[in-house]
UniProtKB/Swiss-Prot annotation:
Similarity annotation: Belongs to the SIMIBI class G3E GTPase family. UreG subfamily.
A molecular function GO annotation: GTP binding
NCBIfam families recorded: ureG (TIGR00101)
Name by which UniProt lists this protein: Urease accessory protein UreG
Gene coding for it: ureG
Function statement: Facilitates the functional incorporation of the urease nickel metallocenter. This process requires GTP hydrolysis, probably effectuated by UreG.
Binding-site residues for GTP, renumbered to this chain: 12-19
Length: 207
């Protein structure tokens, strides 16, 4: 019996690289499983349109949800608008293996209730500063996977990357994290492996 697609919530501050991560995952996985994407923006469908322009998925597999809410959550706390989008995608594509749900904001607890997402990925930006891991916000501490993005910017913004990783490790404890450069595709394989390992995602072999 099918339990339906794996639903993965992607959150993080504006500009951290959530849409780039979503795009890279689509490029890596679209030919290996049946997948779809839901993006959440405040008043526009900008992220959905960016994914369509990138042509990583057919347009009918991308849903742009306009939440009209606070930019720090951008997925309503009751999740109903996103649950409706999930249900619509499952009706349209009954064979779905994976749905990525990209938040427009960084409040992970409000963003992804357990009824909406099976796993959560939180993205932070190295350029946001050395002390981000030490602040230990809920997204950073509690997400199922933390992606520390734009590590190549560290020397340009005065961030000691070794210390940043040590602080990240301390903040995460036993929870996994990935040091990444999403634009270059660095870290994508580790995230795919996480989805297979923790989410039970079954993929066709690489071409």
């Amino acid at each position: 019996m099918s339990h339906g697609p794996l639903r993965v919530g992607i959150g993080g501050p504006v500009g951290a690289g959530k849409t780039t991560l979503t795009e890279k995952l689509c490029a890596a996985l679209a030919h290996r499983c049946s997948m779809a994407v839901i993006t959440n923006d405040i008043y526009t469908r900008e992220d959905a349109e960016a994914l369509m322009r990138a042509q990583v998925l057919p347009a009918e597999r991308i849903r742009g949800v306009e939440t009209g809410g606070c930019p720090h959550t951008a997925i309503r706390e009751d999740a109903s608008i996103n649950l409706a989008a999930v249900a619509d995608l499952r009706r349209t594509f009954p064979d779905l293996d994976l749905i990525l749900i990209e938040s427009g904001g960084d409040n992970l607890a409000a963003t992804f209730s357990p009824e909406l997402a099976d796993l959560t990925i939180y993205v932070i930006d190295t350029a946001a500063g050395q002390d981000i891991p030490r602040k230990r916000g809920p997204g950073l501490a509690r997400s199922d996977l933390l992606v520390v993005n734009k590590t190549d910017l560290a020397p340009h913004v005065g961030v000691d990357l070794a210390r940043l990783e040590a602080d990240t490790q301390a903040a995460r404890g036993q929870r996994p994290y990935v040091m990444a450069r999403m634009r270059a595709g660095v870290g994508v394989e580790a995230i795919v492996a996480f989805l297979e390992r923790e989410g039970g995602l079954q993929l066709l072999p690489q071409d």
